[in-house]
Curated annotation (Swiss-Prot):
It catalyses: 1-(5-phospho-beta-D-ribosyl)-5-[(5-phospho-beta-D-ribosylamino)methylideneamino]imidazole-4-carboxamide = 5-[(5-phospho-1-deoxy-D-ribulos-1-ylimino)methylamino]-1-(5-phospho-beta-D-ribosyl)imidazole-4-carboxamide. One of its GO terms (molecular function) is 1-(5-phosphoribosyl)-5-[(5-phosphoribosylamino)methylideneamino]imidazole-4-carboxamide isomerase activity. One of its GO terms (cellular component) is cytoplasm. Pathway: Amino-acid biosynthesis; L-histidine biosynthesis; L-histidine from 5-phospho-alpha-D-ribose 1-diphosphate: step 4/9. Its main location: cytoplasm. This is 1-(5-phosphoribosyl)-5-[(5-phosphoribosylamino)methylideneamino] imidazole-4-carboxamide isomerase. CDD domains: HisA (cd04732). The gene is hisA. One of its GO terms (biological process) is L-tryptophan biosynthetic process. Keywords: Amino-acid biosynthesis, Cytoplasm, Histidine biosynthesis, Isomerase. It comes from Herpetosiphon aurantiacus (strain ATCC 23779 / DSM 785 / 114-95).
Amino acid sequence: MQLIPAIDLRDGRCVRLVQGDFEQTTVYGDDPVAVAQQWEAAGAARIHIVDLDGAKAGRPTQTSTIAAITKAVSVPVQLGGGLRDAASIAAAFELGVSDVILGTVAVRNPELVAELVRQYGKAITIGIDARNGVVATEGWLASSRQRATELAEQMGQLGVARIIYTDISRDGTLSEPNYAQTAALVTPNGPAIIASGGIARVEHLARLAELGISGAIIGTALYTGHIDLASAIQTIEHGG
């Protein structure tokens, strides 16, 4: 199981939210590029970036910071936040990211997702963010009527290779992942499932690996020191 450190961008800084609430923002650094280099040095094979301002605005806004990060590290960088049309997705790849994460558009316009998968293949990742199993959209500020399991099945049928599942109620809380909801998305020959939200201990990562989860995105726990990335990678990815 791959461990993926998260960098959430807001106003050019590295921040974390609690349960997606923009009013509960903690700043963890003014130099996201240095943070990305830190995670690469710790052994990360991939870095996860969310443009929080972009998610709220409906279009990417932190483009200069994102481009600086992709130039500063040699590992793949995946980007989410405000990518809701073909033009913004093409522009994201121009910034040097290896993968884009689509959330709202998967609910609103699955036909576009199918078209993008045909064009970009495995570089298209779907982000399913849910409260009580129901998918949220618009930077978590709106709720759809679609269940996460239904959306995951639909995306798999469209050829999506990877899905990131975030339990919003756990995100930034350092409680524990929602094992049941996350595992419910794992299907034979279906998309690889990556867990996000609530991870606070290496034991949480080990449990996710046992459930057949392909990857785990770690945010708050890295910035608070609850998890040491280099040590966790050694334990989880390399078997101790």
